[in-house]
Amino acid sequence: MWERERSPIRNDEQHLAGEPSLKAVRFVSRQEKPFKVNMLREAGSYFLRTLTLQYQPVYIAALGATAFQLGVANSIGGLSAVAIALPIGWLADKYGVRRIFLAATGAMLFGAFLFASAESWTIVILALLIGNLGLQMETTACPIVCGSCLKDKERATGMGLCDTLTAIPGLVSPLIGAVLITRFGGLNVNGIRPLYYLQVIGFSMILIFILVEFTEPKRRGLKIQSGFNESIRELFDRGTKLKSWILFVSLSTIPLYMATMVYVPFFAAEIKQANAFVLGGMAMASMVMPLTLSIPLGRLADRIGRKKVLYLTTSIYCLSLLLLVYAVDSTMLLLSGVLQGFSVLASVTRGAMTAELVPTALLGRMFGTLGLFRGLVMILSPVGGGVLWTAIGPESVFYVIIALQVLSMFLLVTMPETSSSRHVTTRT
């Protein structure tokens, strides 16, 4: 069972309130080794992913894809995430997250190699399939480490701190990408391709790092004995309002796969005529809010509840999309990028809340189940965005996203607050 020692937890929060750099170091240093090693692993992985994130839609289009084909490619690429989501959660519970991290990094390495060697947009589909497979495995395993190593009352704070520290490389990677793209020829295939070769080298180094340094979290030592189907039934028997939560998370994930990964950078480049440095600046700007507010918002979520923080962060993210649509210059695009960072803050809070809706031993299955539905969103969202872009107009993509986020907030009203309770075992 999770410890509930109130006084030490209050002290942890006070430690993070003053002299934040020193206190953050103390907070991290007293955590278990798997938590600290995972932070370094995620920081490296995040750097490599954000190196190409803003430029990937432009790269695929430069290989010959139209706006609709861009959506189709990303949608097909999401099939692997759907196929692997539930088994990965179950395997993480049964065999541990270390093996999942190794497989995930290997898949992302191979996906990066396929991107680097692609000569047409159709080849990119295979790269997306394999890369998304690795990303799905990583996304499922990573929060299990935090859920296993952090105490209940400090979870949102700890996850916010983890998000802050691992996001720091994301401040420099888009700028590095912009410099390299400019050096190698601009926003075209030859200019963007070298970034994927850098990913190949980087993921190779992370793979070695996991092999040498990562050990299984102690609290994950429990092995499940039931079969796959029985274990999923157990999840819904012992979880709290999981059906409503899964629907909420699915709606909340649409911006990532329709906007952030596909149509925000494509819209900025094609409609607003943003160059490589503006695209990179938007990506860098999106990390400003996570870096400055992750810890304060984590503490706030621990104190006043996760739901209120989610209402706030989701609303500001919707405002960022309106700024993007109505931007008349690069300054407005950069401001939109700053506010888009609130989607990252919302995802951290959702992760903390997810970990409190099920018993600790079921975390792998919980995040695996969410991964299944995220995968479905990954399939449907890009092609849906492509249809909207082609049939109605580019701006309609973002109006629909805003409407769906408003709907998600109404759904959140039906969920119980989790920050002061743990593990209701009634089926809902």
Predicted features by range, described:
Residues I84-G96, I181, T292-G305, W389:
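Helix-to-loop junctions at the C-terminal end of transmembrane segments
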Residues S21-A83, K241-A283:
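Helix-loop boundary and gating motifs at the non-cytosolic
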Residues F209-I224, V413-T425:
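Helix-loop junctions on the cytosolic side of multi-pass membrane transporters
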Residues R99-L114, K308-L323, I402:
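Structural signature of the two symmetry-related core transmembrane helices
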Residues M137-L150, L345-V358:
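Intracellular juxtamembrane helix-capping segments at the cytosolic ends
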Residues W2-E5, R10-F35, T215-L247, T428:
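Juxtamembrane intracellular "pre-TM" segments in multi-pass secondary transporters
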